[in-house]
Amino acid sequence: TATVDCSGYPQSACPQDYVPFCGSDNKTYSNKCNFCNAVADSNGTLTLSHFGKC
């Protein structure tokens, strides 16, 4: 299972880089920062499905 270290999130501003992550909600997040912010907002219910677009 793919995992991401989201310690230090959420962050108030994310970079614009595009390195997609596919979440367990079947949504593509544009980069680690956006994905980890969503994980923080989900109280741990959101996980990484795989790296790359969904």
Curated annotation (Swiss-Prot):
Coiled coil: none annotated. GO terms for cellular component: extracellular region. It holds the Pfam family Kazal_1. Residues 4-54 form the Kazal-like domain. GO terms for molecular function: serine-type endopeptidase inhibitor activity. Glycans are attached at residue 43. The record marks 16-17 as: Reactive bond 3. Its main location: secreted. Keywords: Disulfide bond, Glycoprotein, Protease inhibitor, Repeat, Secreted, Serine protease inhibitor. Disulfide bonds join 6-36, 14-33, 22-54. It is found in: Secreted. Avian ovomucoid consists of three homologous, tandem Kazal family inhibitory domains. This is Ovomucoid. It comes from Gallirallus australis (Weka).
